[in-house]
């Protein structure tokens, strides 16, 4: 990967800047427990995955889509026998996902601050990193609120929230930012949504795995000459050091 011409660094949000999937996993496992009178936990997990995948085209990503899939799975698998109070409990647990703390993951704020300072102090902006961007997918209000709860919003020059993240969305982001794809570096935890489409349109990428991956985001691992994998967030500064 060549960092010498990078003008924009775009960061994914969920499970890159803060933990998101971990909170969803807790709620999902509660559903599996509640469905034990009808099916084993493994079957319950498969049923939820099947429901989420079926609903993806119409509902997209986010808490609302997840909530509808959770309730649909609960009622279908239990053959509408699950008590109303249990259904309500599942609903309330899903609601809680709209307010969980978005505490920045280790080294995230330190790294963003260092990059922000370098941009502010650089004396050759025509050849230097000029912008930090948050590029995330999901429901507009939910993603906006999570960014606010994280306290990280002031580090970003621009925030783009989309319903999906594919090649078309990456091309559109480059157009809006007026950069060539090779001048943008995408940093994220999802090979499927962050890394593969960014590389496909010509961007560079830094892959930072998270300890848990949503089943619908899983992707076979691969290597690429324009991709670097890091183990912890501050390594991004090492990668950018020659450029900064």
Model segments located where?
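Short, surface-exposed acidic
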Residues: 36-51, 79-90, 155-158
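Asp-based, Mg2+/Mn2+-dependent phosphohydrolase catalytic module
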Residues: 1-9, 109, 113-118, 133, ...
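A metal-dependent, Asp-based hydrolase signature
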Residues: 51-96, 114
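Active-site neighborhood of HAD-like aspartate-dependent phosphohydrolases
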Residues: 1-47
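Active-site periphery "cap/insert" segments of enzyme catalytic domains
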Residues: 97-114
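A short mid-domain helix/strand-loop element embedded in enzyme catalytic domains
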Residues: 87-93, 104, 139-144
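Intrinsically disordered, low-complexity terminal tails and inter-domain linkers enriched
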Residues: 117-130
């Amino acid at each position: 990967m060549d960092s010498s011409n990078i003008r924009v660094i775009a960061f994914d949000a969920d499970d890159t800047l803060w933990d998101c999937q971990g909170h969803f996993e807790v709620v999902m496992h509660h559903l599996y427990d509640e469905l034990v009178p009808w099916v084993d936990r493994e079957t319950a997990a498969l049923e939820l995955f099947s429901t989420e995948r079926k609903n993806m085209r119409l509902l997209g990503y986010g808490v609302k889509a997840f909530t509808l899939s959770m309730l649909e799975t609960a009622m279908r698998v239990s053959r509408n026998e699950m008590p109303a109070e249990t259904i309500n409990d599942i609903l309330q647990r899903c609601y809680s996902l709209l307010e969980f703390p978005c505490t920045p993951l280790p080294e995230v704020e330190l790294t963003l601050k260092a990059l922000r300072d370098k941009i502010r102090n650089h004396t050759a902006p025509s050849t230097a990193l000029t912008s930090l961007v948050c590029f995330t997918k999901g429901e507009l209000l939910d993603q906006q609120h999570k960014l606010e709860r994280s306290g990280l919003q002031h580090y970003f020059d621009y925030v783009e929230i989309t319903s999906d993240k594919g090649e078309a969305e990456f091309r559109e982001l480059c157009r809006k930012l007026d950069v060539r794809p090779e001048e943008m570096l995408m940093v994220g935890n999802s090979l499927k949504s962050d890394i593969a489409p960014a590389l496909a349109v010509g961007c560079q990428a830094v892959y930072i795995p998270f300890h848990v991956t949503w089943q619908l985001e899983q992707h076979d691992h691969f290597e690429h000459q324009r991709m670097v994998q890091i183990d912890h967030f501050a390594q991004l500064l090492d990668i950018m050091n020659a450029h900064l």
